[in-house]
Amino acid sequence: MDSDQSFNATLRMFDTHVNLLEILHGKPAMATVSLFSGGFFTGRPQTHDHSSLLGMRPKKQGHSSRPLKLHLRHTPDGYNLIIKNTGEHDNKPIGKRWLDVLGAQDPGPDKSMLFTLVDRQNNPITLKNMSTPQVPVSLMTENKKYIGGLKVRGSPYIYLAETEEKSKVTFILSVL
Protein backbone atom coordinates (compact mmCIF):
# COMPACT_ATOMS: atom_id res chain seq x y z
CA MET A 1 0.00 0.00 0.00
CA ASP A 2 1.32 3.43 -0.97
CA SER A 3 -0.06 5.83 1.63
CA ASP A 4 1.29 8.87 -0.28
CA GLN A 5 -1.14 8.05 -3.10
CA SER A 6 -4.11 7.21 -0.81
CA PHE A 7 -6.69 9.94 -0.20
CA ASN A 8 -10.26 10.79 0.83
CA ALA A 9 -12.76 12.02 -1.75
CA THR A 10 -16.42 12.27 -2.61
CA LEU A 11 -17.92 10.62 -5.66
CA ARG A 12 -20.92 12.28 -7.31
CA MET A 13 -22.49 13.12 -10.65
CA PHE A 14 -23.85 16.43 -12.03
CA ASP A 15 -27.52 15.49 -12.28
CA THR A 16 -27.65 12.29 -10.23
CA HIS A 17 -27.12 11.38 -6.58
CA VAL A 18 -24.73 8.46 -5.97
CA ASN A 19 -24.65 6.57 -2.67
CA LEU A 20 -25.87 3.52 -0.78
CA LEU A 21 -29.52 2.80 -1.54
CA GLU A 22 -30.43 3.28 2.14
CA ILE A 23 -29.21 6.89 1.90
CA LEU A 24 -30.84 7.54 -1.47
CA HIS A 25 -34.20 5.90 -0.74
CA GLY A 26 -34.37 5.23 3.02
CA LYS A 27 -33.84 2.07 5.01
CA PRO A 28 -34.85 -0.61 4.34
CA ALA A 29 -34.44 -0.37 0.56
CA MET A 30 -36.51 -3.42 -0.37
CA ALA A 31 -36.69 -4.87 -3.89
CA THR A 32 -38.76 -7.78 -5.20
CA VAL A 33 -36.83 -9.31 -8.06
CA SER A 34 -37.66 -12.05 -10.55
CA LEU A 35 -34.57 -13.67 -12.02
CA PHE A 36 -34.41 -15.00 -15.55
CA SER A 37 -31.79 -17.26 -17.08
CA GLY A 38 -31.52 -17.77 -20.83
CA GLY A 39 -35.03 -16.40 -21.29
CA PHE A 40 -36.51 -18.76 -18.69
CA PHE A 41 -38.09 -17.78 -15.39
CA THR A 42 -36.01 -19.30 -12.57
CA GLY A 43 -38.33 -19.11 -9.58
CA ARG A 44 -40.77 -17.02 -7.60
CA PRO A 45 -39.99 -13.34 -7.11
CA GLN A 46 -38.03 -12.82 -3.91
CA THR A 47 -37.86 -9.71 -1.77
CA HIS A 48 -34.45 -8.62 -0.53
CA ASP A 49 -33.07 -5.69 1.45
CA HIS A 50 -30.75 -3.82 -0.91
CA SER A 51 -29.89 -1.05 1.59
CA SER A 52 -26.15 -1.79 1.48
CA LEU A 53 -25.93 -1.77 -2.34
CA LEU A 54 -24.73 1.25 -4.32
CA GLY A 55 -27.06 3.07 -6.65
CA MET A 56 -28.01 6.34 -8.23
CA ARG A 57 -31.11 8.52 -8.24
CA PRO A 58 -31.90 11.56 -10.39
CA LYS A 59 -31.54 14.78 -8.38
CA LYS A 60 -35.06 15.88 -9.31
CA GLN A 61 -36.52 12.79 -7.55
CA GLY A 62 -37.03 13.08 -3.80
CA HIS A 63 -34.90 14.85 -1.23
CA SER A 64 -31.29 15.87 -1.65
CA SER A 65 -28.63 13.41 -0.64
CA ARG A 66 -25.07 13.81 0.55
CA PRO A 67 -22.35 12.57 -1.82
CA LEU A 68 -20.68 9.20 -1.32
CA LYS A 69 -17.56 9.74 0.78
CA LEU A 70 -14.69 7.32 0.14
CA HIS A 71 -11.14 6.56 1.16
CA LEU A 72 -9.16 5.49 -1.90
CA ARG A 73 -6.45 3.16 -0.65
CA HIS A 74 -3.67 2.95 -3.24
CA THR A 75 -2.08 -0.38 -4.14
CA PRO A 76 0.35 -1.19 -6.97
CA ASP A 77 -2.61 -2.61 -8.97
CA GLY A 78 -5.27 0.05 -8.34
CA TYR A 79 -7.40 1.50 -5.56
CA ASN A 80 -9.49 -0.21 -2.89
CA LEU A 81 -12.57 1.95 -2.31
CA ILE A 82 -13.53 2.17 1.38
CA ILE A 83 -16.85 3.78 2.38
CA LYS A 84 -16.37 6.72 4.76
CA ASN A 85 -20.04 7.64 5.30
CA THR A 86 -20.94 7.73 8.97
CA GLY A 87 -23.17 4.84 9.99
CA GLU A 88 -23.42 1.09 9.69
CA HIS A 89 -21.27 0.78 6.56
CA ASP A 90 -18.44 3.13 7.54
CA ASN A 91 -14.99 1.62 6.82
CA LYS A 92 -16.39 -1.18 4.67
CA PRO A 93 -14.80 -1.87 1.29
CA ILE A 94 -16.80 -1.72 -1.93
CA GLY A 95 -17.08 -4.97 -3.85
CA LYS A 96 -19.47 -7.04 -5.95
CA ARG A 97 -22.42 -8.16 -3.85
CA TRP A 98 -25.33 -9.37 -5.99
CA LEU A 99 -25.23 -10.10 -9.70
CA ASP A 100 -22.62 -7.53 -10.80
CA VAL A 101 -23.94 -4.86 -8.39
CA LEU A 102 -21.52 -3.07 -6.07
CA GLY A 103 -22.11 -2.56 -2.39
CA ALA A 104 -20.61 -2.41 1.08
CA GLN A 105 -18.85 -5.62 2.06
CA ASP A 106 -17.56 -6.96 5.32
CA PRO A 107 -13.76 -6.58 5.29
CA GLY A 108 -11.74 -9.63 4.32
CA PRO A 109 -8.62 -10.33 2.28
CA ASP A 110 -10.46 -12.37 -0.36
CA LYS A 111 -13.23 -9.79 -0.84
CA SER A 112 -11.29 -6.66 -1.74
CA MET A 113 -11.93 -5.35 -5.23
CA LEU A 114 -9.51 -3.10 -7.08
CA PHE A 115 -10.52 -0.15 -9.24
CA THR A 116 -8.57 2.04 -11.65
CA LEU A 117 -9.58 5.68 -12.03
CA VAL A 118 -9.58 6.56 -15.73
CA ASP A 119 -10.08 9.77 -17.69
CA ARG A 120 -12.21 10.16 -20.82
CA GLN A 121 -9.44 8.64 -22.97
CA ASN A 122 -9.15 5.64 -20.58
CA ASN A 123 -5.78 6.82 -19.24
CA PRO A 124 -5.20 5.84 -15.59
CA ILE A 125 -5.40 8.64 -13.02
CA THR A 126 -3.70 8.71 -9.61
CA LEU A 127 -3.50 11.40 -6.96
CA LYS A 128 -0.04 12.27 -8.30
CA ASN A 129 -1.32 13.26 -11.76
CA MET A 130 -4.55 15.04 -10.76
CA SER A 131 -4.22 18.69 -11.73
CA THR A 132 -7.32 19.95 -9.89
CA PRO A 133 -9.21 18.86 -6.75
CA GLN A 134 -12.28 17.95 -8.86
CA VAL A 135 -11.71 15.47 -11.66
CA PRO A 136 -14.12 13.70 -14.05
CA VAL A 137 -13.38 9.96 -13.77
CA SER A 138 -14.78 6.60 -14.70
CA LEU A 139 -14.07 3.50 -12.65
CA MET A 140 -12.58 0.42 -14.29
CA THR A 141 -12.52 -2.90 -12.44
CA GLU A 142 -9.70 -5.42 -12.37
CA ASN A 143 -11.77 -7.39 -14.96
CA LYS A 144 -11.34 -4.44 -17.38
CA LYS A 145 -15.04 -3.59 -17.11
CA TYR A 146 -16.54 -0.26 -16.13
CA ILE A 147 -18.91 0.92 -13.43
CA GLY A 148 -22.26 2.04 -14.79
CA GLY A 149 -25.97 2.02 -14.08
CA LEU A 150 -27.95 -1.23 -14.05
CA LYS A 151 -31.73 -1.58 -13.94
CA VAL A 152 -33.03 -4.98 -12.77
CA ARG A 153 -36.52 -6.24 -13.62
CA GLY A 154 -38.84 -5.82 -10.66
CA SER A 155 -36.60 -3.43 -8.73
CA PRO A 156 -37.41 0.28 -8.43
CA TYR A 157 -33.70 1.15 -8.14
CA ILE A 158 -30.84 1.94 -10.49
CA TYR A 159 -27.77 0.12 -9.22
CA LEU A 160 -24.07 0.79 -9.72
CA ALA A 161 -22.66 -2.34 -11.30
CA GLU A 162 -19.87 -3.75 -13.41
CA THR A 163 -20.87 -3.04 -17.04
CA GLU A 164 -19.44 -2.81 -20.52
CA GLU A 165 -17.71 0.37 -21.73
CA LYS A 166 -20.81 1.63 -23.57
CA SER A 167 -22.71 1.79 -20.24
CA LYS A 168 -19.99 3.40 -18.12
CA VAL A 169 -20.75 6.57 -16.21
CA THR A 170 -18.53 9.56 -15.58
CA PHE A 171 -18.31 10.65 -11.96
CA ILE A 172 -16.95 13.81 -10.39
CA LEU A 173 -14.24 12.85 -7.93
CA SER A 174 -13.62 15.64 -5.40
CA VAL A 175 -10.47 15.26 -3.32
CA LEU A 176 -11.03 16.25 0.31
Give, region by region, the residue ranges found by the protein language model.
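Lectin-like carbohydrate-binding module/patch detector with strong preference for beta-trefoil
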Residues: 1-176
